[in-house]
Amino acid sequence: MHAWPASEVPALPGQGRDLRIHDTATGGPVTLDPGPVARIYVCGITPYDATHMGHAATYNAFDLVQRVWLDTKRQVHYVQNVTDVDDPLLERAVRDGVDWTALAEQETALFREDMTALRMLPPQHYIGAVEAIPGIVPLVERLRDAGAAYELEGDVYFSVEADPHFGGVSHLDAATMRLLSAERGGDPDRPGKKNPLDPMLWMAAREGEPSWDGGTLGRGRPGWHIECVAIALDHLGMGFDVQGGGSDLAFPHHEMGASHAQALTGEFPMAKAYVHAGMVGLDGEKMSKSKGNLVFVSQLRREGVDPAAIRLTLLAHHYRSDWEWTDQVLQDALARLDRWRAAVSRPDGPPAEALVEEIREALANDLDSPAALAAVDRWAALQQESGGTDIGAPGVVSRAVDALLGVAL
């Protein structure tokens, strides 16, 4: 599966700063020091109802991570998956009377278009769950043969007790885990499981649903968590720098994925930092496919909204915050974009070197994009009020906003 085209990242004078970011697993900030090649895995979409603002906010956060690393002159090895076979996708295809593979392809193509328009840097490896199945099967077999998984009526479940570190990502109590498991694709009430929290690794073939050769597992399809584990281990190995996604993935998805990987390899941790973006709401509730309260990037683009304004709307909120999408936040972003473009359209202006350092400092401090935007606002206001004589300063600002924030002025 191919990703989307990369926009050019302008080179900036000076050197970026190491990223200090909130790690869900430790509950506090950690300073990331990846070495010459930074490794990041971000969980991708299930391809239906793409791309809503919750999606866009998540991928904006991890695009900023990449940009901070690139500014430190590191290479970035970025992997993202597509959950292109899953119960919600199959259910949507049945509801709409379409082939599930056609729906997945259509929505993945739309997602690529939206990411291109928003100037999100693409992953080097963009991997669908279906294409990863040949690598998933032997991992499930290994877990089963090692006693870390067991069969139940043809299905295969992971035993959470096989990982002594289970619970170390989300730090939730058992009752909360059980509740969230039921809400987020698990089956804690299924009779016969050793532990209600045990997640499915391999689902035996069901009538009328797609299935694949599972070797000694029999025909079926993989569980959600093992898909990401297989892709991450194949392309990044253990101990990569950042595992990213929305805050609703901390449990069960990232918790279970970490336990799968740690049980498979005997190594700890799967990722050095678990980073989670907040939720975007509409009309007082979290945007979600199940509720249908969605604002789509493609819809706004069709209405003629500049993608740079959409991106500024996302950047106006700290990535870990939960926030509400309203017409006003978009109007504020459009006005900000106009002010910035007017400010950089002049041939000279106030000196820009300090501004570049302010943006760098803000982003290195847990991706504080609102602080970065405020710094640019101050420069633009100074340009509007009194101007300046620094030839080329507007060009420096334009390149910095592009390179560090992904906004084309």
Swiss-Prot record:
<keyword id="KW-0547">Nucleotide-binding</keyword>
<dbReference type="InterPro" id="IPR014729">
    <property type="entry name" value="Rossmann-like_a/b/a_fold"/>
</dbReference>
<feature type="region of interest" description="Disordered">
    <location>
        <begin position="1"/>
        <end position="27"/>
    </location>
</feature>
<keyword id="KW-0479">Metal-binding</keyword>
<dbReference type="InterPro" id="IPR032678">
    <property type="entry name" value="tRNA-synt_1_cat_dom"/>
</dbReference>
<comment type="function">
    <text>Catalyzes the ATP-dependent condensation of GlcN-Ins and L-cysteine to form L-Cys-GlcN-Ins.</text>
</comment>
<dbReference type="GO" id="GO:0005524">
    <property type="term" value="F:ATP binding"/>
</dbReference>
<feature type="binding site">
    <location>
        <position position="280"/>
    </location>
    <ligand>
        <name>L-cysteinyl-5'-AMP</name>
    </ligand>
</feature>
<feature type="binding site">
    <location>
        <position position="58"/>
    </location>
    <ligand>
        <name>L-cysteinyl-5'-AMP</name>
    </ligand>
</feature>
<dbReference type="GO" id="GO:0008270">
    <property type="term" value="F:zinc ion binding"/>
</dbReference>
<keyword id="KW-0862">Zinc</keyword>
<feature type="binding site">
    <location>
        <position position="253"/>
    </location>
    <ligand>
        <name>Zn(2+)</name>
    </ligand>
</feature>
<dbReference type="GO" id="GO:0006423">
    <property type="term" value="P:cysteinyl-tRNA aminoacylation"/>
</dbReference>
<dbReference type="GO" id="GO:0035446">
    <property type="term" value="F:cysteine-glucosaminylinositol ligase activity"/>
</dbReference>
<feature type="binding site">
    <location>
        <begin position="246"/>
        <end position="248"/>
    </location>
    <ligand>
        <name>L-cysteinyl-5'-AMP</name>
    </ligand>
</feature>
<feature type="binding site">
    <location>
        <position position="224"/>
    </location>
    <ligand>
        <name>L-cysteinyl-5'-AMP</name>
    </ligand>
</feature>
<feature type="binding site">
    <location>
        <begin position="81"/>
        <end position="83"/>
    </location>
    <ligand>
        <name>L-cysteinyl-5'-AMP</name>
    </ligand>
</feature>
<dbReference type="InterPro" id="IPR017812">
    <property type="entry name" value="Mycothiol_ligase_MshC"/>
</dbReference>
<dbReference type="InterPro" id="IPR024909">
    <property type="entry name" value="Cys-tRNA/MSH_ligase"/>
</dbReference>
<dbReference type="Pfam" id="PF01406">
    <property type="entry name" value="tRNA-synt_1e"/>
</dbReference>
<keyword id="KW-0067">ATP-binding</keyword>
<feature type="binding site">
    <location>
        <position position="228"/>
    </location>
    <ligand>
        <name>Zn(2+)</name>
    </ligand>
</feature>
<keyword id="KW-0436">Ligase</keyword>
<dbReference type="GO" id="GO:0005829">
    <property type="term" value="C:cytosol"/>
</dbReference>
<dbReference type="GO" id="GO:0004817">
    <property type="term" value="F:cysteine-tRNA ligase activity"/>
</dbReference>
<feature type="binding site">
    <location>
        <begin position="43"/>
        <end position="46"/>
    </location>
    <ligand>
        <name>L-cysteinyl-5'-AMP</name>
    </ligand>
</feature>
<feature type="short sequence motif" description="'ERGGDP' region">
    <location>
        <begin position="183"/>
        <end position="188"/>
    </location>
</feature>
<comment type="similarity">
    <text>Belongs to the class-I aminoacyl-tRNA synthetase family. MshC subfamily.</text>
</comment>
<feature type="short sequence motif" description="'KMSKS' region">
    <location>
        <begin position="286"/>
        <end position="290"/>
    </location>
</feature>
<feature type="binding site">
    <location>
        <position position="43"/>
    </location>
    <ligand>
        <name>Zn(2+)</name>
    </ligand>
</feature>
<protein>
    <recommendedName>
        <fullName>L-cysteine:1D-myo-inositol 2-amino-2-deoxy-alpha-D-glucopyranoside ligase</fullName>
        <ecNumber>6.3.1.13</ecNumber>
    </recommendedName>
</protein>
<comment type="subunit">
    <text>Monomer.</text>
</comment>
<dbReference type="GO" id="GO:0005737">
    <property type="term" value="C:cytoplasm"/>
</dbReference>
<feature type="short sequence motif" description="'HIGH' region">
    <location>
        <begin position="45"/>
        <end position="55"/>
    </location>
</feature>
<dbReference type="GO" id="GO:0010125">
    <property type="term" value="P:mycothiol biosynthetic process"/>
</dbReference>
